[in-house]
């Protein structure tokens, strides 16, 4: 199954432009970004321990900077739950943490709205149950904190109340900017991880 359909919520609905919610607009605007990230992760097989460690390492590096930015820029009470802690603990359990590279800084630009960033980071957690099934016995019980966690799914259910509203005066452009910057940040982390793996080979 494609990365965009397992990591991100698969939705095939259409909405009339005059009734499009912010969620509709974000989903349509970031569809190409879904595809790019899907393709960049397509070679990972989570049933293989080495690929599982790579997958978690990419998420640790990408989410660290994003979480730091959201802590300072999201509305009070709307900061997504921290995932870097569970990921790091899982990597330690799998013996993969020493291979992680320093997390790059996340800077979506002054025009970015935190809601677009939160949309991507929360939506990316929705397919974790499917990924957990893909990993199978390769992922021991003591290393399932990230994929089996419920905190981000609970946050997504709350976030949908904001995403269900109509876009603001800018037509959702600031939220789109934030979401696209977040996708781009993840894609760069995938590239950095590949370079680090090639150098170590």
What are these regions (language model features)?
Residues 1-201:
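Metal- and O2-centered redox machinery and metal/ROS homeostasis
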């Amino acid at each position: 199954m494609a990365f965009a359909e397992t990591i991100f919520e698969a939705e095939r609905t259409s909405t009339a432009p005059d009734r499009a919610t912010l969620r509709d607009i974000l989903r349509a605007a970031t569809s190409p970004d879904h595809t790019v990230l899907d393709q960049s992760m397509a070679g990972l097989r989570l049933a293989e321990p080495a690929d599982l460690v790579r997958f978690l390492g990419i998420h640790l590096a990408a989410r660290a900077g994003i979480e730091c930015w959201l802590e300072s820029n999201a509305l009070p009470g709307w900061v997504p739950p921290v995932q870097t802690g569970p990921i790091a603990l899982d990597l330690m359990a799998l013996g993969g943490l020493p291979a992680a590279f320093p997390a790059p800084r996340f800077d979506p630009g002054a025009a970015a709205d935190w809601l677009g960033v939160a949309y991507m980071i929360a939506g990316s957690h929705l397919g974790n149950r499917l990924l957990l099934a893909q990993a199978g016995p390769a992922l021991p019980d003591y290393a399932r904190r990230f994929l089996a966690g419920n905190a981000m799914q609970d946050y997504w259910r709350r976030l949908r109340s904001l995403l269900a509203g109509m876009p603001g005066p800018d037509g959702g452009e600031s939220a789109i900017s934030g979401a696209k910057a977040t996708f781009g940040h993840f894609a760069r982390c995938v590239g950095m991880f590949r370079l680090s793996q090639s150098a170590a080979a």
